[in-house]
Amino acid sequence: MSNFLTYVKEHQNRFLEELFLLIRIPSISADSAYIPEMQKAAAAVQEALAKAGCTHTELCPTEGFPIVYGEKIIDASLPTVLVYGHYDVQPPDPLDLWDNDPFDPIIKKTALHPDGAIF
């Protein structure tokens, strides 16, 4: 476990930048004006999966926004692990109620506060 924690600490800045890249994309699926941003977010997630070591990634078309799929088969006889999530966000309106830009993550008191994301 200590090797893992050391690795995370050594690469923390890179991890944050990769996370911030996604948070900065206003991927608002409820508003058709943001269709290009949804496509951009899907492509960014696909790229992140590839960088994380997935040997196969794919954008699977749907009637709405694409499903982002990635896999890495280490040994077909081992159990499968599935990670499921979403890459869209809620509309930030009304904007005047935000203290900060909802798509510009900031770090306060060493804690991440991306107003456009929930952790």
What name fits each language-model region?
Residues 78-119:
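Active-site metal-coordination/substrate-binding segment of hydrolases
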Residues 2-95:
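N-terminal helical capping/dimerization or prosegment-like subdomains
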